[in-house]
A protein has these predicted regions:
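C-terminal and inter-domain tail/linker signature
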Residues: 1-114
Length: 114
């Protein structure tokens, strides 16, 4: 499963493995709602997308979980019981073609654990 390899690479902080699972023309789009730091424009290419994802996953105290995101496999990043990011993925073959990254705290409430 592509998303599981993506999650494992993120969890290890392995930029080489992370880049290998991203398609050459991968696009990453963030929704920060202007409430938290995040890129305003879509990111294009393995290097830009890998840099953002690596930054998110390296935050202190963040745990990763592979979960269903909009009916597809994705990642939920939590600090304790609170979701800090949800990453939806669209795959093409054995690579990730598109990532949708929700950082907007107003949209993460349903992902918190009680």
């Amino acid at each position: 499963m592509v998303v599981r390899r993506f999650a494992e690479a993120c969890g290890r902080g392995d930029v080489t493995a992370l880049t290998a699972v991203l398609g050459v023309e991968v696009v990453g789009t963030c929704d920060s709602g202007g409430l938290v730091p995040g890129p305003d424009e879509p990111l294009h290419g393995q290097a830009e997308v890998a840099r953002l994802v690596t930054t998110l996953c390296r935050r202190a105290g963040v745990d990763l979980a592979v979960e269903s995101v909009n009916g597809r496999a994705g990642l939920v990043l939590r600090r304790g019981s609170r979701a800090v990011a949800v990453i939806g993925a669209e795959t093409a073959g054995y690579e990730i073609a598109t990532l949708w990254i929700v950082l907007n705290p107003a949209k993460l409430g349903d992902w918190h654990r009680s």
